């Protein structure tokens, strides 16, 4: 059974834009992306929207629907009342390219800043082994489809553009946490990097990133909070503290 519903779709580019009202047919079983495609086909032939798999596994169609970051391909029209106006806008934290398409290159830049996995120097192909519990501990994080909705909803980025230079965001702090807990990774400075370079201290664990994750990854509880705890343990470790005092005293004597 079909029905006519009201949509408000953001149209424009980085210089100017606004919401456009449109009435469109909605059929049983459809998702928001289906309706956007119908609007493209019948009323707005030049409407720009990014999408790919239409199965909730590529993260391409992330946008804000009624003010909340969602995947358009996974948001069912049956969740809206017939009289409700569905407002569709681009992800607010990133610059608009056109219409519903945003420039998410900020995330690619942050990904490149994260040092990659560093295996033991003397290891040969096929020699590395891990306990199953270590494999399972970080398996959750690898479910990420890079929709960047966690990045978009994080208020440190969303409300403070100036923080982007010094804050990696929940998606890439999660990556730092994953590598830091990897038993075979040889880098020992990941906690320092997370705190001093990638802005872990900016996160105040509101869990908004966890709430919007379409893969239901517990970003805050299983990645960010444990990483914060390890950073604190390292900074206030009594042996490390005593060692730093001794070294500082020796430096003073030498000078």
PLM features: what roles do these ranges have?
Residues 76-77:
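A generic structural motif
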Residues 53-60:
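Short, structured protein-protein interaction patches enriched in aromatics and acidic/basic residues
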Residues 19-31:
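Short, contiguous acidic and Ser/Thr-rich linear segments
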């Amino acid at each position: 059974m079909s029905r006519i519903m009201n949509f408000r779709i953001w149209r424009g580019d980085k210089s100017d834009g606004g919401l456009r009202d449109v009435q469109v047919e909605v059929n049983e079983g459809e998702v928001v992306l289906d309706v956007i495609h119908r609007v493209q086909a019948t009323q707005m032939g030049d409407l720009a929207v990014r999408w790919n798999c239409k199965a909730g596994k590529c993260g391409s169609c992330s946008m804000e629907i009624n003010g909340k970051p969602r995947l358009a391909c996974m948001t069912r029209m049956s969740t809206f009342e017939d009289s409700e106006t569905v407002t569709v806008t681009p992800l607010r934290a990133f610059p608009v390219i056109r219409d519903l398409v945003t420039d998410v290159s900020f995330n690619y830049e942050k990904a490149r800043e994260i040092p990659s996995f560093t295996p033991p120097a003397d290891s040969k192909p096929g020699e590395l082994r891990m306990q199953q519990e270590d494999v399972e501990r970080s398996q959750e994080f690898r479910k990420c489809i890079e929709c960047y909705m966690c990045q978009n909803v994080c208020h440190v980025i969303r409300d403070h553009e100036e923080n982007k230079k010094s804050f990696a965001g929940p998606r890439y702090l999660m990556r730092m946490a994953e590598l830091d807990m990897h038993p075979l990774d040889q880098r020992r400075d990941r906690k320092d990097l997370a705190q001093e370079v990638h802005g872990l201290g900016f996160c105040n664990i509101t869990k908004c990133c966890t709430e919007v994750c379409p893969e239901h990854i517990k970003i805050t509880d299983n990645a960010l909070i444990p990483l914060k705890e390890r950073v604190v343990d390292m900074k206030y470790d009594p042996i490390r503290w005593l060692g730093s005092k001794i070294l500082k005293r020796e430096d003073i004597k030498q000078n």
